[in-house]
């Protein structure tokens, strides 16, 4: 029997076997939590223990937990805590800190160096972690995808997708892609500058999430880590008390 990790997001659902203190080979369903309903039950693994992180709607989380409880002897759901695996969360009320951000920090802390952790999903999240595991807070904004969707919802003539990044675009689709991607990059760059001032050293930049690949060409020196949340979930799992 085996232990598995499950990350239930707004736009993607990912799972992987637990291998030591990291995630093994990751499988993903592109349509996230809602797409889960169309999957046959046998497409999910079974085993001894399921470790689950979810930022999806409560009804979808409940549906997934119901399936997992039929396939695993034990099911553990992550909750953000003030401290775990050497990471100390800056929020006065840690339960208000998103579990995906929490797990990303647990994974990033393993390197024991200052790091700016950037998540690009429905939201753009930016969190600063120092080499000692102290979280210094962060920012939340709309991701480029969400910016595009919001503009399209208010002005249907503005396409929600398409276009290529250009510093000075000469058509609408490119201008939208450039503006929304550029806004995200500017916030990341501003955060990196302020982090350098605060810590006295430039942090490394660690980027994850479904929207990350589009930004990577604009972030020289950044590292892309697509399984960061699952790796953080693995660290959370191995740092839980026995039993």
Swiss-Prot record:
Chain positions recorded as substrate binding sites: 91, 98-101, 172
GO molecular function: ATP binding; pantothenate kinase activity
GO cellular component, one term: cytoplasm
Cofactor: NH4(+); K(+)
Residues the record marks as active site: 100
Gene3D superfamilies assigned to the protein according to its UniProt record, in alphabetical order: 3.30.420.40
Biological process according to GO: coenzyme A biosynthetic process
Catalysed reactions, semicolon-separated: (R)-pantothenate + ATP = (R)-4'-phosphopantothenate + ADP + H(+)
Stated role: Catalyzes the phosphorylation of pantothenate (Pan), the first step in CoA biosynthesis.
Assigned protein family: Belongs to the type III pantothenate kinase family.
Designated name of the protein: Type III pantothenate kinase
């Amino acid at each position: 029997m085996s232990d598995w990790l499950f990350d239930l997001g707004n736009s993607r659902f990912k799972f992987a076997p637990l291998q030591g203190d990291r995630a093994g080979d990751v499988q993903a369903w592109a349509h996230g939590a809602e797409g889960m309903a169309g999957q046959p039950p046998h497409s999910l693994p079974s085993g001894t223990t399921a470790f689950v992180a979810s930022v999806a709607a409560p009804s979808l989380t409940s549906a997934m937990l119901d399936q997992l409880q039929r396939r695993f002897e034990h099911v553990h759901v992550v909750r953000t805590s003030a401290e775990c695996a050497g990471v100390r969360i800056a929020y006065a009320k840690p339960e208000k800190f998103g579990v995906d951000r929490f797990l990303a920090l647990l994974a990033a802390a393993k390197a024991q160096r200052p790091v700016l952790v950037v998540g690009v999903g429905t939201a753009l999240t930016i969190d600063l972690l120092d080499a000692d595991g102290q979280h210094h807070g962060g920012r939340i904004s709309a991701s480029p995808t969400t910016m595009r969707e919001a503009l399209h919802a208010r002005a249907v003539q503005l396409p929600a997708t398409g276009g290529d990044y250009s510093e000075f675009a000469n058509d609408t689709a490119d201008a939208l892609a450039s503006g929304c991607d550029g806004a995200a990059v500017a916030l990341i760059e501003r955060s990196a500058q302020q982090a350098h001032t605060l810590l006295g050293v430039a942090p490394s930049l660690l980027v994850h999430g479904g929207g990350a690949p589009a930004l990577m060409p604009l972030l020289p020196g950044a590292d892309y880590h697509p399984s960061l949340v699952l790796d953080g979930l693995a660290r959370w799992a191995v740092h839980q008390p026995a039993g």
